[in-house]
């Protein structure tokens, strides 16, 4: 029984000893408001900028009222500021009529774009058969040109082999040089043939024009004779 009693007395002494120490902390009192408005020194460079603005003066008036010395008329926006606020309000908060008009314009523009796109598609679809025909014609002409070039190349190679002999390698420099010469000669002959055909066509056109002029002259002369 002695041990529990001793332990109880020790705990009581510990409680009595630690009690005052646990209550030694005292929180600081809440900050008091200034009884009068605080106006910063404008000449002091350490004064915060926000304390020199009209917003700070409005805050002092709202906190202290008339004793702040701020005229209530200065709290209202000026004419210029009011115009800026109205313009900003019209820009960011337009009226219902303005929004409806803007929506109508957007819908008209979208409808115009849709109609233009549909018209463009219709025009393209109308041109599609002719475009397909032109594409097929161009493809056929390219194929014919390739085949003609192959045949011309084969004829030139055959002619070169006839001149040099079939024992000459077609990949040799001598064979390729002769092939180039034959190609140049053939191109020259084709060019001369085209020029001759153009010249003959021009002469035929001039002769036809002269014959037509003479026929018109004879007709006019015959119509000018007096009838018997």
Swiss-Prot record:
Keywords: Cell cycle, Coiled coil, Mitochondrion, Nucleus, Ribonucleoprotein, Ribosomal protein. Its main location: mitochondrion. Gene3D superfamilies: Growth arrest and DNA-damage-inducible proteins-interacting protein 1. A motif (Nuclear localization signal) lies at residues 184-200. It comes from the Eukaryota. Residues 98-207 form a coiled coil. Residues 20-44, 186-228 are annotated as: Disordered. Residues 212-228 have a biased composition (Low complexity). It is found in: Mitochondrion; Nucleus. GO terms for cellular component: mitochondrion; nucleoplasm; ribonucleoprotein complex; ribosome. It holds the Pfam family CR6_interact. Residues 186-202 have a biased composition (Basic and acidic residues). Belongs to the mitochondrion-specific ribosomal protein mL64 family. Component of the mitochondrial ribosome large subunit (39S) which comprises a 16S rRNA and about 50 distinct proteins. Interacts with GADD45A, GADD45B and GADD45G. Interacts with NR4A1 via the NR4A1 AB domain. Interacts with ATAD3A and ATAD3B. Acts as a negative regulator of G1 to S cell cycle phase progression by inhibiting cyclin-dependent kinases. Inhibitory effects are additive with GADD45 proteins but also occur in the absence of GADD45 proteins. Acts as a repressor of the orphan nuclear receptor NR4A1 by inhibiting AB domain-mediated transcriptional activity. May be involved in the hormone-mediated regulation of NR4A1 transcriptional activity. May play a role in mitochondrial protein synthesis. This is Large ribosomal subunit protein mL64. It comes from Rattus norvegicus. The gene is Gadd45gip1.
